[in-house]
Amino acid sequence: MLKITSADKYFSLCVREQAKFTCERCGTFAPPELSKRLDCSHFHGRGKWSVRFDPDNATALCMGCHLYVTAHPIEHMAFIQEKLGPYRFQALAERAQDMARGRQARREVKEIGKHYRQQLEFVRQGQPLEGYL
């Protein structure tokens, strides 16, 4: 089990807030007070530090959809490809393999947490989520 950092907490909240606490796959609404029913799902798992805090790598999914896409990786890939489009999907795959980017994220995890804490206010004002790296 990976340790949940402040950066993870604020990044996850930003992803769910940007989705208006609605599952991006099935449309189920999970109000903020029930936000534990909505996960921040990573296409490339959280262990892949190079894209752990990358908005293109994260989707707000209800628990049911999160379990489903985890059990059906081909459908998960198709869902993410449709969401991002071919160019952004390929760019995400390339960033996922960038080891220097992963090392940077590990070194700067506290700064990443501060960044997403600030981003949360912008997202709540309707602005798009901006990544850190």
Go through the PLM ranges and name each one.
Residues F11, A19, K36-D39, D54-L61, ...:
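Amphipathic alpha-helical interface surfaces
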Residues M1-T22, G102-R106:
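Short, charged surface segments at domain edges that flank catalytic/cofactor-binding sites
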Residues E24-T59:
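Histidine-centered nuclease catalytic patch
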Residues T28-P31, A58-L84:
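Short Cys/His-centered divalent metal-binding micro-motifs
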